[in-house]
Amino acid sequence: MLFRSAASAEYVDVDEILKPKETEPLILVLDGVEDPRNLGAILRTAECAGTDGIIIPERRAVGLNDTVAKSSAGAIEFVKVAKVANLNRLIEKLKSKNIWVVGTSGDATMDYTEWDWTRPTALVLGAEGSGLHRLVAENCDVLVKIPMYGKIDSLNVSVAAGVVLFEAKRQRNLTTDN
């Protein structure tokens, strides 16, 4: 399989991701993900889960590059990716469009399965190791956690994306099947 190079990958404007659609939006926001293989895996997961797009910060985060393209296994062709200068302003914009902003944090009290993912939602995932920046976490409408049952206290960010996005997809499928 041939992978598109990052040179041919184009960012879209945030408003392209936020365009109204027939279904409630499910948007992924990444706060400082720096590993290109993680971003590639997240692109692949986001495409498979049917998200509307991914929004990343312009600084202190990996952008689209050849490693991301290869790690995405072709998903870079289909997922809309936008860059923004300020995630906190983005969160304000999302809220103004009645999109719930749900961050992930190991310190959260709500389990990710307790959130109603059928709502218009932007899922915010933090950087490898450090998680969400303090202001980003404070600006989220709600924080959820993925419970850990072993001795390690967190998942890789790309794995966490898969766990939560597919819970959102599961809940959305339940409402459309009824």
Where are these regions (language model features)?
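Post-transcriptional modification and biogenesis factors for structured RNAs
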Residues: 1-178
